[in-house]
Amino acid sequence: MLTAIRKYIAVFGRANGGVAIVEFAFVAPVMLVLALGGVDVARYVIATEKVTKVANTIAQMISVNNMPSTTNPQYGAVNYIDLQFYHDSAMVIFPDMLADAAQQNISWTKDISITMSSVNFTTVQTNCGATCTYTPAVVWTGGDNPRPCSPALIQAVDASIPSPTTLPADVFGPGSVIVVDVQYNFHPFFGTYIPAPIGIARSVYLAPRYKPQIIYQVITGDNGIVKSCP
């Protein structure tokens, strides 16, 4: 009996017919996780590119506005109709955001935050050239999460994470700059283990192209999308 058992064990030990199945059972879950994770990584990269494109496009549309202000013709002017159009253009630039919002059963404006601002720089120094110290002041700001009118925006390292209270050091200088901040809530398809969406934030800074400054002009029917800073 003992000899028969030993012989059976020896035969079983030499058998390799089920090795592939056992190996597959170990490897399959890992491969599945990598495949699903790869899909979300690709979606994240695409979403990042689209958020950057939204910020760039809106900033460019504002910066090239050369309609003269009725109060100061040397400046360009935008009104609530212009800025509402620029804001809503995100639906065309980033249509996947609409699908994501529908999947979350929320309005698309709750899935992405778009803020548009004009910042003017001043200095009390004269004939200082490259050594001038400039103080930024928000002239107007509007959208989903307006920048604060005060205190003055803080100078930050150029590679810093975008913040509504800071500006990159490189944009400090004479004149003004248009600032567009975009924040998107990325929801992974297969990331149900992540309790909250992953935020993607991008900010773009462009100087007005044809006018020294773009001011906000209140017209009849103004919907309050923008607040002017004192």
Regions found by a protein language model. Give the residues of each.
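Context-gated lysine
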Residues: 7, 50-53, 110, 211, ...
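Intrinsically disordered, low-complexity regions enriched in Pro/Ser/Thr/Gly and acidic residues
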Residues: 95-201, 205-208, 215-222
